[in-house]
């Protein structure tokens, strides 16, 4: 890889800043964050201070970010669940590949619309299930597998 893949992050909460953005610190040769959006000014300031994202590339809403020309190769959508589909569809319209936090949507029609748009745009959409690899879920799995609450 000659240069890192660029990312814009919609939603700078625990997932956006601590799960996804932190990867840049571990692998700067693979990932560069170029823009972000969050209603909390302290989170935007953290993105600027910790990841070198210019103030002009930090926005108060995902909609403001998505109104810009495309600022990265990939859009990470880690906003509130109810915002996922609209932001994902808008990001695909801009030509972004997507890393999409779960849930995509509780509605099958919206999931199918997103799948269709991604196919038409020839874009990759990855839906994340990152917690399944945490120690908490591993312990829970072992307890259930061992019959701690009976047969499931």
Model-derived segments and spans:
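N-terminal Rossmann-like dinucleotide-binding module
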Residues: 1-53
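Conserved G/P- and acidic residue-centered "switch" motifs that form tight phosphate/ATP-binding loops
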Residues: 11, 102, 147
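Alpha-helical structural signal in soluble globular domains
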Residues: 22-27, 47-51, 90, 94, ...
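Short loop/turn motifs at secondary-structure junctions
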Residues: 30-32, 52-54, 71, 148-151
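Short, well-ordered coil/turn segments that N-cap beta-strands
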Residues: 31, 73, 96, 123-124
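Beta-loop-alpha module in the N-terminal Rossmann-like domain of NAD(P)-dependent dehydrogenases
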Residues: 53-117
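A contiguous active-site-proximal alpha/beta segment in oxidoreductase catalytic domains
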Residues: 105-152
